[in-house]
Amino acid sequence: LESEHWDIVPGGKYYVTRNNTSILAFKVGTKLDNYSFNIVTSHTDSPTFKVKENAEIEVKNKYTQLNTEGYGGMLCATWLDRPLSIAGRVLVSEGNSIVTKLLNIDRDLLMIPNVAIHMNRAANDGFKYNLQVDMLPLLSAGDDRQKDFKQIIADELGVKKEDILGHDLYLY
C-alpha cells in the first residue's frame, strides 16, 4: 500500500495499484548521486463510451439500444459501422460480500450504425453528431437476442443476474 513503509533500494522496481483501476510503477536508478527523476504517464480510458446503469433502451419492441455517455474527446465517425464489444468491472453479490469481477465480452456484440443518406442529407456536410441520439449502440447479440443485456453479462461471468449490483463498463 502507498501508506506503508517502503524499503527503496538502488535499482529496485516497485508498483502500487489504486482502486483496481490504476497502476503506478517506477524504477529507482542504480546511482543516486543525482536526485532528479523523470515522470512518464499514460492512460487507456479515453476516448470511449461508458455504459450507463439500466442501460437498455427498447425501441418500438423491435430492437435494443444501450444508453451510453461519451467520455473524452472523440472522433465520432471512427466508432460507426464497426463491430464493438464491452469490457470493464462488474460488482457482484457473493454471500455477504461484494466482489469485483472483470468482464471482457470477446465477441461482436454492438454496433453504432450510420443512418442511410436519405435519412440524413447532412451526413457529408459536416454533420454534428448528438452523442445521446446518433451514437447509441445497437445490441446485436446474435444467439443471445432473447436475453437482456444484464443476462448476457451474468452468463459471461457465470453469476446470477439478480446478483449483479452495478458495473463500470466501456465499449471497445
Language-model segments: what does each one mean?
Residues 1-172:
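N-terminal hydrophobic/helix-forming segments and targeting peptides
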